């Protein structure tokens, strides 16, 4: 048996001595048992307790696409989830087609990309912002909008946000892209959980362009908080943000993704084929008996738009 010398803080030594006295053991015996138990835990309990030693070869990583996200499944039991979005001709510049301030644009860039990643059950770790505009003032305004939106789900943008701007040439139209990288345990991914007889519900109404501004003010569109609320409910099975292809297209992908058919239901006044712009609608497949619970949870327009067959 080898002897190992280690330095420990006084507080830890006080705890060790207290335990030694309580159980009539020597200090070294307490340390030996503590280390033995810890090593046993690392060896046998869950992937999240193991130190991550990524000695991973590319051939060991499986790549899949799920809607607007890419998923890299690692042999460690973890999954890296990436989502991205882009915008052009929307912003405060001279030749932008939709005139909004930079903060508003940043908010919705963050909302779209974060929704896609969070909907899978992954936790966002990194946001990478690439801007085709100057840093000051437009870039700073867009960045501030992203930071505010990130804070709504508990992220610290000063730690997770990377930025790159175009400062070599003057720009007259706004262009921006945002990529979000998240991490999850593979067995906790919220993918392919939809079940036969599930209802497909739409939270929010599809809005695009200038419609989004008024709809946001009137509480008619889905937001990040709603996705987080859905993630916390066991009666919610799969979640998907709707983009430019519309509600019907996204709902069909949810059904086909689990090898099922979709019975489409078109509520009066809701266009299932209209673009939902910057993820103004979120779809969820739910236990049919919990529809009233969902409506009580989220005070937004909620419509049943389909049933999984």
What are these regions (language model features)?
Residues 94, 107-109, 175-180, 190-233, ...:
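Conserved mixed alpha/beta catalytic, RNA-binding, or beta-rich assembly cores of soluble enzyme
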Residues 1-11, 17-20:
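Short Lys/Arg-rich basic patches
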Residues 141, 145-156, 233-237, 242-309:
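Glycine-/charge-enriched secondary-structure boundary and capping motifs
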Residues 54-143, 147-175, 179-203:
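Glycine-rich phosphate/pyrophosphate-binding loop regions near the starts of catalytic domains
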Residues 18, 40-60:
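Short, positively charged interaction helices/loops
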Residues 26-48:
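Short, basic amphipathic alpha-helical segments that act as recognition/interaction helices
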Residues 7, 181, 283-287:
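Short hydrophobic/aromatic beta-strand micro-patches
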């Amino acid at each position: 048996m080898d002897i190992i010398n280690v330095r420990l803080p006084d507080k830890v030594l006080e705890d060790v001595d207290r335990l030694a006295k309580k159980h009539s053991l020597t200090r070294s015996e307490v340390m030996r048992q503590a280390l033995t138990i810890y090593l046993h835990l690392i060896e046998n309990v869950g992937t999240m307790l193991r130190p991550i030693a990524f000695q991973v070869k590319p051939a060991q990583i499986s790549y899949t696409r799920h809607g607007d996200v890419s998923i890299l499944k690692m042999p460690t039991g973890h999954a890296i989830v990436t989502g991205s979005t882009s915008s052009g001709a929307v912003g405060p510049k001279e030749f932008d087609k939709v005139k909004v301030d930079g903060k508003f644009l940043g908010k919705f860039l963050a909302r779209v990309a974060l929704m896609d990643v969070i909907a899978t059950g992954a936790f966002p770790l990194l946001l990478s912002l690439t801007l085709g505009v100057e840093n000051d003032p437009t870039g700073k305004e867009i960045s501030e909008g992203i930071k505010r939106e990130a804070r709504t789900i508990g992220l610290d943008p000063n730690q997770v946000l990377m930025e790159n701007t175009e400062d070599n040439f003057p720009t007259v139209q706004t262009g921006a892209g945002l990529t979000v990288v998240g991490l999850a345990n593979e067995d906790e991914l919220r993918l392919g959980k939809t079940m036969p007889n599930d209802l497909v519900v739409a939270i929010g109404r599809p809005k695009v362009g200038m419609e989004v501004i008024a709809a946001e003010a009137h509480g008619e569109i889905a937001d990040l908080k709603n996705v987080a609320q859905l993630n916390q409910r066991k009666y919610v099975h799969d979640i998907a943000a709707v983009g430019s292809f519309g509600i019907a297209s996204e709902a069909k992908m949810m059904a086909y993704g689990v090898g099922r058919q979709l019975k489409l239901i078109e509520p009066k006044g809701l266009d299932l084929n209209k673009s939902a712009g910057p993820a103004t609608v979120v779809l969820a497949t739910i236990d049919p008996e919990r529809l009233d619970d969902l409506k009580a949870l989220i005070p937004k327009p909620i419509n049943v738009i389909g049933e999984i067959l």
